[in-house]
């Protein structure tokens, strides 16, 4: 009989401004060292700048940006007969959103603007127009998936 306690997933509350789970999750990815209030300020500032520049609803903008970046497949490696194959696997919506948010946050830190707020604004605007490093990362993943389509029937 197992003595381990059952693991319950932590519930992430919706963000206070838009009431959205997706935005609350995005703020959690931006957060560093537990400073959620600072992460919220950074995110809301960048969203307000983007909505002013593009003259659109900020919530719809975020959904479009995440849709542009999120992948449909993921690559898992499997060793069969002494060689390692990269097998493309279809992923669910939550996992693809996780990848898109992580890529946006990671690639915004690599940009050359001053301050993280401006870096995030630049990355989000470029992601809206499909010109960002995050969308390039998605395209590279899609190329690898196309090369390894023959192995998609393998089971993991």
Curated annotation (Swiss-Prot):
Keywords of this entry: Ribonucleoprotein, Ribosomal protein, RNA-binding, rRNA-binding, tRNA-binding
GO CC annotations, alphabetized: small ribosomal subunit
Keyword Repressor: no
MF terms (GO), sorted A to Z: rRNA binding; structural constituent of ribosome; tRNA binding
Disulfide bonds: none
SUPFAM superfamilies: Ribosomal protein S7
Summary of subunit composition and partner proteins: Part of the 30S ribosomal subunit. Contacts proteins S9 and S11.
Protein's name in the database: Small ribosomal subunit protein uS7
Protein source organism: Carsonella ruddii
């Amino acid at each position: 009989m197992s003595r381990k306690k059952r693991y319950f997933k932590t519930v992430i509350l919706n963000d206070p401004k838009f009431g959205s789970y997706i935005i609350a999750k995005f703020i959690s990815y931006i957060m560093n060292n537990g400073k959620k209030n600072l992460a919220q300020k950074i995110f809301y500032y960048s969203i307000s700048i983007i909505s002013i520049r593009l003259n659109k609803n900020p919530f719809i903008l975020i959904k479009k940006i995440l849709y542009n970046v999120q992948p449909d497949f993921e690559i898992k490696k499997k060793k069969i007969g002494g060689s390692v194959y990269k097998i493309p696997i279809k992923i669910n919506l939550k996992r693809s959103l996780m990848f898109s948010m992580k890529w946006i946050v990671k690639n915004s830190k690599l940009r050359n603007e001053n301050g993280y707020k401006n870096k995030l604004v630049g990355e989000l605007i470029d992601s809206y127009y499909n010109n960002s490093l995050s969308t390039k990362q998605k395209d590279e993943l899609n190329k690898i998936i196309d090369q390894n389509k023959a192995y998609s029937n393998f089971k993991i």
